[in-house]
Amino acid sequence: MQATNLKTNHLTQPLGIDAGTLFLSWQCAEGVRQTAYEIEVTAGAETLWASGKALGSVMHTETPSAVPPKTQGRWRIRLWDENDQPGAWSTASFETGLAQADWQGVWVCPETEEPDIDCADAINAFAKPNWEQKQAALEASGKGQAQPYQPHRPASYLRKTFTAPAGESKRLYITAKGLYAAWLNGKRVGDMVLAPGSFTADKHLGAQTYDVTALVREGENKLLIALGDGWYRSTSGVDGDRDLFGKEVAVLFQLEVDGKAVCISDDDMEATQCGPIRQNDMQQGEVYDARLEGELSGWHDVKTEPNSLPITGMNTVPIREQEAFAGRLLRTPNGETVLDFGQNMAGYVEMKLTAHAGQKLRLLCGEALDENGNFTQENFQDRNRHKEGGTAQMLELVCKEGENHYKPSFTIMGFRYTKVETDIDLTGAEFTAHAVYSEMPVTGSFACGDADVDQLVKNSVWSQKGNFCDIPTDCPTRERAGWTGDMGVFIETGLTLMDCYPVVEKWLAECRLNQYPDGRMANIAPPTSRPGYMTPMLCMSAGWGDAAILVPYALYKRTGDRKILADNYQMMQKWYAFLLGRAQQTTEEQQTGAYAKYTVLNGLDYGEWCEPGITPMQAMMNPRKSVGTAYLAYSGRLLAEIAQALGKAEDAAQYRDTAEKAVKAYRTAFTDNGKITSDRQCEYVRAIAFALLGEEESQAAADTLNRMVAENGYHLNTGFLSTPFLCEVLAKYGYADTAYKLLLQDTAPSWLYEVKQGATTVWETWTGIDANGHPSESLNHYSYGAICGWLFGGVCGIHLAGETLTIAPTPNPALGWAKAVYDSPVGRIESGWQYAGDAVTYTITVPCNRTAEVTLPDGRSLTLQPGTHTL
């Protein structure tokens, strides 16, 4: 037996993680059962920890003591099998980054004066008229003085020449206020794009560590760094706010040879803004003048600032270019030249073409064609609110003579289609779309007898790819915001479809930083706009704030890593105390009885967001909405389990007590002695899924829910919070046929309507493109892709929670056959079934070192050993 897939802090061969204890995990290959393991952690010739032979089948452990900063370490592991025979050693490497006190450099700011920017370029041509109109209206209203339009800025370039000694180990530690790209002696450092990533950058930043041993030579070296605006000061969110975290971009770096700094960021540098990137903005786009390629000019001195901002290590996976798609040229009815890349994605377009000097080419990126087949961005629906007239997603290339090759550096866009505006002859031109997202392997695959369902799963994966660029976001176009509610409903599915633990863990750190002192949760982390009048009120919303509990809990249950609970425990406690505090404000006029003070009726909630037939305002203003009380019960139970896992028995008892009182409060306030009388599907789904009713009451509620779905023509009528549970609760209480009819429904509202409309990602709303072909809202939102959780966990029945693997498939002739494959933290799990007449054959694969408790629809229960089984 041998250990495989070794990970350190859920990362493969990490470089530059924070110092501290290490979470070490592995999988087992060969053999049946691991009976013991032995681990050795070393740094050079020094042994940092040796476990000795540790008995047990667990496939993870934590080092008992912290690993220091700047440690280039290795760990190796061997396993004993069921016959007590040891296998061969397996080895992995890791490296910790700088501690805060190790940084010797200062922040270097390249901009010393306002740049001279041509306002006739692409970005300003779009934004300036709208800006001036809004400012004139502001002044006319007497609410403020009109401000002049500020053009988007060029990228800055910084250079430094330094001398390096010979050495065996050379590291570049670097971060930026903004985005950076670095070159050593003319060669690009690393392959991460949009570095250093997305942070609440006025509170902390993360730094990357690069192994530059092959790039730094003995003697003289040249370092070049490009800086863009990035998340730091670009236009952001639906409001189009700029400078959210600061007004000046800057870089901080330290280059070491064998552990000693030989080059740091300081005032002994030069900078210029005269490079080819004339304007850059994460949301709006880039202007690139190829005539300025080559030797840079206009070098000047820099400014510096002390380094007082907390800097963490590279505790996540890098953002990289991933799949590439060639564009298909088409002509629209309006005569537009449009490229169709065939896949909605987040990324950018690379172009190669021949032109004359000064000729221009402009690209506008969007998700859809309109009902007439013409290019549109109107589905972004942010034109009126956005300070620059909406999300531009523009690229402009000013060509040099001859061959031109341009790929954006400091922007990202959500698109499938690109409109091309140019007088250049495009014969022989090449346009390639690059998908850009965090390095996350796909871990879940599903196939069945219905091609549309297969496409739904593919769409869900692509929406996850398009919205996991360093942090999970709602959409890659209009908002690009790390909404808590979206992650709360999708986390279980997301962990199955892709190995996203590091991305979500990083985002939780942003949630902690942005939590209000009174416990309410920022709906978006990091922030994408300046807070408005309603912001603090909406940040008390149940379901959204509960992501503080739901998300760490899900990460823990999949991996067994208690550190994720410990890191976020205070955030969970503060949120839950705030939610309970809302309940404690309940007055006798609102609710009476022994459990009135556990009924959440005060404050503002988003409610059952995007529920068909209910406007957002109706969802929020319903004075008797049950959402808050339901989550007080549900999250309280989870928090009790979390406290127990952390060894906090008193806390656990307190949270269990509160949760059970909230259950009784729910029954008192929102049921008639356990009977739900609502005409909304969501009320039944939530009450059943959250175990707010007794077993017989849940069955009665499911009976009613089934009837409501049938009377609605087998269409769902649920919204944001309850849709992920809909098919699950129907199938659990005997209505699998109804669940399958919902799954296979292809008229709106349904999951397959968008597939029939040609979608390649999941939409924000059920009718993102209506029956007339008119697009609206975001066409790349992962939230409703949560149905895939039921395909894996219901249709094929795979459930992994810590050490426990259960498989309980729910076959149905409507699909004919189905198979799910999950490359889980404990190894590959497979579950499939196929009909042959009335007979069903099941095929199940259990990974090494696990057993599976299998329950079949005919009532049989089996315990399966590792291997593939046909039943």
Language-model-derived ranges and their functions:
Residues 247, 252, 264, 268-292, ...:
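Non-catalytic C-terminal accessory modules of carbohydrate-active enzymes
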Residues 285-289, 479, 497, 547-549, ...:
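C-terminal capping/lid segments that line or modulate ligand- or cofactor-binding pockets
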